Regions:
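Hydrophobic/small/kink-forming positions within alpha-helical transmembrane segments
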Residues: 68, 119, 123, 127, ...
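Specific alpha-helical transmembrane segments that line the substrate/conduction pathway
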Residues: 85-96, 131-164, 292-311
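C-terminal transmembrane-helix exit sites in multi-pass transporters
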Residues: 99-105, 152-177, 304-323
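Hydrophobic/aromatic residues within transmembrane alpha-helices
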Residues: 77, 86, 132, 162-164, ...
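Hydrophobic transmembrane alpha-helices of multi-pass small-molecule transport proteins
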Residues: 93, 98, 122, 168-191, ...
Length: 345
């Protein structure tokens, strides 16, 4: 590999340069599948140090594509390993992947107050996301729950305005209202924006929908806190480890669904973990060296991309009213984003 020569000099984990002396020895000790994995990790580090801003932006956009698969893959995995067991397996594999890419988290860089609250917000977010999707009763409900989760961009922007002093135009309220009307349209089912339709739909699985809403709030709180304290580096690996431990504890204490390790189950677990872990890796490259404005704008369309993926992967039947609501959610997020921009576009 041409990359091996560069690895002799530096091997960046996104936080610091880690010196490696015997790269050839490490590489030669791997079997063929692990050599491929090693090369993938090495390429990510190599790209993070040797690309232009436009290339970094393009790589960061891959995260949008990867994260669009997460909802449908979590659902598919839960059908094979159960909601709790499947989530535990996914986050365990994601933890390993993130630690290999970013290295061991350096918790000394953070104050204890930040670690405490960030852990609560991040872990709460990931638990609510995985379990709300895992306990969905059907494919359509999976996509609806995922759409409620995608209120997080709107909540994040509002958090930045209310708690971090982010200046905003008055019409940010229009974006907020538009997003909620979009969710109401989605939850109304085939009847569109209807209170009776929303009530009938939500009462079939109130816990799932409430967990999805809590997920959006937790993630917005985590982003707002991290931006407020201006935390440097990446503590995601530590938070993913906490999520994994809690899920395994829940599984062994009260789990009733046995883990199925057939080829299909393992495939879904690896795919879900890869989309989650590699998504963070390429997003880190994008936001550190690319155009953050482009990446932020693209991320607001993840709800539509995710719904498109779900309609094929888990065969979710999606009506015209659903797409109208999804479009309103995206439009509301974009309006909120534009209302906080300091320069016109």
């Amino acid at each position: 590999l041409q990359i091996e020569g560069r690895l002799k000099q530096s091997f960046s984990d996104g936080l610091e340069t880690v010196k490696i002396i015997n790269v050839e020895t490490i590489y030669s000790n791997y079997d063929k599948p692990n050599k491929t994995i090693f090369s993938t990790y090495a390429m990510i580090h190599f790209l993070s140090q040797n690309i232009s801003s436009k290339q970094a932006t393009a790589i960061g956009l891959l995260a949008v594509a990867l994260w669009s698969f997460v909802i449908s893959l979590i659902r598919s995995l839960s059908l094979h390993m159960g909601a709790v067991g499947g989530a535990a397996m996914m986050y365990t594999l994601s933890t390993v992947l993130i630690w290999l890419i970013f290295g061991r988290p350096h918790l000394r860089n953070y104050n204890r107050g930040y670690l405490l609250w960030a852990s609560i917000f991040f872990v709460g977010c990931e638990l609510c996301l995985s379990l709300s999707v895992g306990f969905a009763q059907n494919a359509r409900q999976t996509v609806e729950i995922g759409m409620v989760n995608y209120l997080w961009p709107t909540f994040t922007i509002l958090g930045a305005v209310c708690f971090n002093g982010q200046p905003a135009k008055w019409w940010i309220g229009i974006g907020f209202v538009l997003s909620f009307f979009g969710i109401a349209t989605v939850l109304g089912g085939d009847g569109g924006l209807s209170l009776s339709g929303i009530y009938h739909n939500v009462r079939t699985n109130p816990v799932g929908y409430l967990m999805a809403l809590a997920d959006a709030l937790f993630w917005a709180a985590y982003c707002t806190l991290t931006a407020r304290v201006k935390a440097e580096g990446s503590s995601v690996g530590f938070f993913f480890m906490l999520v994994s431990l809690l899920l395994w504890a829940e599984y062994f204490i009260g789990g009733t669904h046995s883990l199925n390790f057939d080829a299909e189950s393992v495939g879904y677990a690896l795919a879900a973990a890869s989309c989650m872990g590699l998504g963070y890796a390429v997003w880190n490259i994008g936001i550190s060296r690319g155009n953050m404005t482009v990446l932020a704008g693209a991320s607001y369309f993840i709800p539509v991309f995710s719904a498109l993926v779900s309609s094929f992967v888990i065969s979710a039947p999606l009506s015209v009213q659903f797409w109208q609501g999804a479009g309103m959610v995206c439009a509301g997020s974009v309006v909120c984003w534009l209302a906080t921009r300091r320069k016109s576009i």
